Every structure is written in structure tokens, then in C-alpha cells.
């Protein structure tokens, strides 16, 4: 829980529609069984990318997003959207920590007006590192989240 929302935080209804689609990088992190996800594991992320994270793991074996990595994605790479495979990636960490150290991934993304899409399924079916990704939310005011139909389109070439 947060006592205050980040200053300048937009709701999903306020964000420009192009925020929810575009070029995405698919980061399958099967090699990180039970380990933190660090910036060096995400070298293929370009500035402005939609980032899709997945792995074959579940439970305690899932890799997790380190708080510093979340802020690196949001503030240095300026990603457009974060998509998380669940199970596969543990992204909501430190939820019981006192503010402002709780939920670092959630804070990094929402504090920088970057939507989080989860739970994504079938990421392991993607065969290309870069795809076109579309995830349009319902246009519902005063909601932090809503249902989406997430679609990844691979290039036929």
C-alpha cells in the first residue's frame, strides 16, 4: 500500500494510445533460475522498447526483478511498457517493506508512467527476439488496472 501516489502519475485513461503498442523485445530468462534479473541480463533492451520478460520457472525458482534493474529500465532505458510472464518472473518484490522501499518495480514503472502488463501467457511460444506487441486497456477512468487482450506479432521474414 502507498500513502501517496507519485507526483505526475497518469491513469491508464490519461496515457496516449500509442503507449500500448509498438516494437517489443522478448527476454526469455530461463538461465536465471532463482536469480535476480540485472541490467547485464537485458543488454538487448533498446531505449523506448516495450519489454517482455519470461522464463520457464515458477515459484521460488522464478527470476525476480531487482529494484535497481526496474529503475534502470524506467529511467535509463525509458521503456514504453513492461510485460511480465506469470508464472515465470517474480516482479512484485518487497511488498511488506516500509515505504518508499516497498514494491520497487511497481514504483519505478508507475512513477514514470510506464504501464505494466501481467500475467502474460505463452511467451515461450515466441521464436523471435523482437516482435510487434499490442495490449489495449479498457478506457475506464479512475482505475489503476483493467483487462487487456495482449498480442505479439512476429515478422514472417
Q: Each predicted region: which residue ranges?
A:
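Active-/binding-site microenvironments in catalytic and ligand-binding cores
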Residues: 1-157
